Amino acid sequence: MANPIVGRVWKFGDDINTDAIIPGKYLRTRDMQIFGTHAMEGIDPEFTKKAKPGDIIVAGTNFGCGSSREQAPLALKHSGIACIVAKSFARIFFRNAINIGLPLMEADVECQEGDEIKVDLFKGEVLVPEKGIFKGNKLPDFLLDILNDGGLVAHRKKVKGEHK
């Protein structure tokens, strides 16, 4: 995992649910590219045509609410989103994102869509040029380890290999 993560901002509001992140009609596939090309389609059907790899989502409260579908963070990851910063996350979305290696941070950040920001997960900070540094909730070391290893499965394989 790169740190800090630098990218262009896409802004979303409160209560962005998993049905908006990846509509249910795409859930029968296992093709990650299909998930990636339909990310955020429930809010902005053109999102994946505009978003670029390395971009960052900044959102309000309760991001990822709704169903517990793991496909929601997978869709964002495979669309090229590098990180999500939100005031708060639905807990199951938060853990699903960590499990698949999608970095996120809880922070209340003042920025505009299109701004380039820098997210430092190790410090728990978001730098918005000309607006300053916004403190967020630093992830515990064990979650940072999972993200650094690329997700929970890769992390468990690494840990298991270290204990042989």
UniProtKB/Swiss-Prot annotation:
Pathway: Organic acid metabolism; 2-oxosuberate biosynthesis. The record marks R28 as: Critical for substrate specificity. GO terms for molecular function: homoaconitate hydratase activity. Keywords: Lyase. Its EC number is 4.2.1.114. The keyword Manganese does not apply. GO terms for biological process: coenzyme B biosynthetic process. It catalyses: (2R)-homocitrate = (2R,3S)-homoisocitrate; (2R)-homocitrate = cis-homoaconitate + H2O; (2R,3S)-homoisocitrate = cis-homoaconitate + H2O; cis-(homo)2aconitate + H2O = (2R,3S)-iso(homo)2citrate. A motif (YLRT) lies at residues 26-29. The keyword Lyase applies. Component of a hydro-lyase with broad substrate specificity for cis-unsaturated tricarboxylic acids. Catalyzes both the reversible dehydration of (R)-homocitrate ((R)-2-hydroxybutane-1,2,4-tricarboxylate) to produce cis-homoaconitate ((Z)-but-1-ene-1,2,4-tricarboxylate), and its hydration to homoisocitrate ((1R,2S)-1-hydroxybutane-1,2,4-tricarboxylate). Is also able to hydrate the analogous longer chain substrates cis-homo(2)-aconitate, cis-homo(3)-aconitate. These reactions are part of the biosynthesis pathway of coenzyme B. Heterotetramer of 2 HacA and 2 HacB proteins. Cannot form a complex with LeuC. Belongs to the LeuD family. LeuD type 2 subfamily. PANTHER family: 3-ISOPROPYLMALATE DEHYDRATASE SMALL SUBUNIT 1, 3-ISOPROPYLMALATE DEHYDRATASE SMALL SUBUNIT 2-RELATED-RELATED. HAMAP family: LeuD_type2 (MF_01032). This is Methanogen homoaconitase small subunit 2.
